[in-house]
Amino acid sequence: MFSTSDQVSKMNSRILSALLILGIATCVIAGGFCPKSRHPQCDLSYKINDCCAQSDCRVGSVCCVEGCGNVCRAESDTPLGEKFVDGSECKHGHVFPKKWYQFW
């Protein structure tokens, strides 16, 4: 049969495995907030969107709404900026306002 040291060893490995999985899940779920906007106001007559979904950004970055367009920023632990909502209307690249003849 098994000795008590084998049973303790198996129990310890199961506990460590569970803690490891919990730790990894916490890292994946934690954070994910946008930091404070660097440029809340934009002086340009157009916007430049570098991202239109969270999947457009690298791991550890978040698609954030800035004054001059959406940009990928490093994740923050506190929600100080505005995170882009996947599924919202968005166009990559330079986005110009309506042409003068489209206002009427």
Curated annotation (Swiss-Prot):
Signal peptide: 1-30
Main location: secreted
GO terms for cellular component: extracellular region
Keywords of the record: Antibiotic, Antimicrobial, Disulfide bond, Secreted, Signal, Toxin
Protein name: U20-lycotoxin-Ls1c
Family: Belongs to the venom protein 11 family. 02 (wap-2) subfamily.
GO molecular function: toxin activity
Classification via InterPro entries: Elafin-like_sf
One GO process term, biological-process aspect: defense response to bacterium
Keyword Membrane: no
UniProt subcellular location: Secreted
Function: Has antibacterial activity.
Modified how: Contains 5 disulfide bonds.
Disulfide bonds: C34-C64, C42-C68, C51-C63, C52-C90, C57-C72
Tissue distribution: Expressed by the venom gland.
Span of domain WAP: 31-76
